[in-house]
Amino acid sequence: MTIRAVVRGVGHYLPDRIVPNSELEALVETTDEWIRTRSGIERRHFAAEGQTTSDLAARAARAALADAGLQPDDIDTLIVATSTADLTFPSAATMVQAALGMSRGFAFDVQAVCAGFVYALANADALIRSGQANRVLVIGAETFSRLMDWSDRATCVLFGDGAGALVLEGAEGAGTSADRGILATDLHSDGRFKDLLYVDGGASTGSTGHLRMQGREVFRHAVEKLAETAHTALDKAGLTSADVDWIVPHQANLRIISATAQRMQVPMDRVILTVQDHGNTSAASIPLALSVGKARGQIKEGDLLVTEAIGGGLAWGSVVLRW
């Protein structure tokens, strides 16, 4: 008998405020054409004043619980992947736990920037496989709009706010690649590249800081490492790119997404795309794309999915799962 972490429900939340590229033209020296050409982004959502990452996460969590037909106290573990927690501590996860009215279980944050949701899924899978939890609510939530340097026109136009969530539940499988649930994970990091993508603030500086990125270098590493980790995870599952129904990538940049799909020899009509509507929502981007992909009728039960992401650290990884 093999225990698999199977998707029971999915949901997402986007703040009400939609910021089209045309609005950013008034803030920085840029154009709609420039942004679209370099990133594929047309619009993004920004959180309202006073609206926090944990607020977004709780809304997405409720949507995922409703989709699963579960109540908060049916959950054993709650994991939030975020780099923009409300406070230095306590964790965003415990704040969401309180907001949902959960009176049992345990909650914690995972911080791997844009790769955070992949890391969180791997943690949830390990908890379920080891028997430490049966139902895990995994959330990716970010308010990156608050980290932007609005004088850095190459970076500030790329990011948005949002949250997505999955409910994973342990279920018996046959131990084959035909099982539903998470089939394989692959995680990596290399701190030698920390200066390529980081925020120049934190407890040691006494300020929140702003996001700093060497875009060309990040692009180069992303295209190379994302295809590699996806192939590794597929190999662990005994599968190949030809078996993939959908790539659900981190929605950072359309050029990165396209180049990675090309390296994997997967056509773009088998890639879930939301970057045009959400921008880069960091750890929220993959669960947002999963939720939107299901709502569109693209992702169906039994489909084989590969999710992959890379973020500051550098940290990167992938998950192969059957929906």
Swiss-Prot record:
Source species taxonomy: Bacteria, Pseudomonadati, Pseudomonadota, Alphaproteobacteria, Rhodobacterales
Iron as UniProt keyword: no
Family: Belongs to the thiolase-like superfamily. FabH family.
Entries under HAMAP family matching the protein: FabH
Catalytic activity: malonyl-[ACP] + acetyl-CoA + H(+) = 3-oxobutanoyl-[ACP] + CO2 + CoA
Name of protein: Beta-ketoacyl-[acyl-carrier-protein] synthase III
Protein's organism: Cereibacter sphaeroides (strain ATCC 17025 / ATH 2.4.3)
Start and end residues of each stretch annotated as ACP-binding: 251-255
Record GO terms (molecular function): 3-oxoacyl-[acyl-carrier-protein] synthase activity; beta-ketoacyl-acyl-carrier-protein synthase III activity
Transmembrane spans: none
Quaternary assembly: Homodimer.
Record's GO cellular component terms: cytoplasm
Top enzyme category: transferase
GO biological process, one term: secondary metabolite biosynthetic process
Keywords for the protein's UniProt record, in alphabetical order: Acyltransferase, Cytoplasm, Fatty acid biosynthesis, Fatty acid metabolism, Lipid biosynthesis, Lipid metabolism, Multifunctional enzyme, Transferase
EC annotation from Swiss-Prot or TrEMBL: 2.3.1.180
Biological pathway: Lipid metabolism; fatty acid biosynthesis
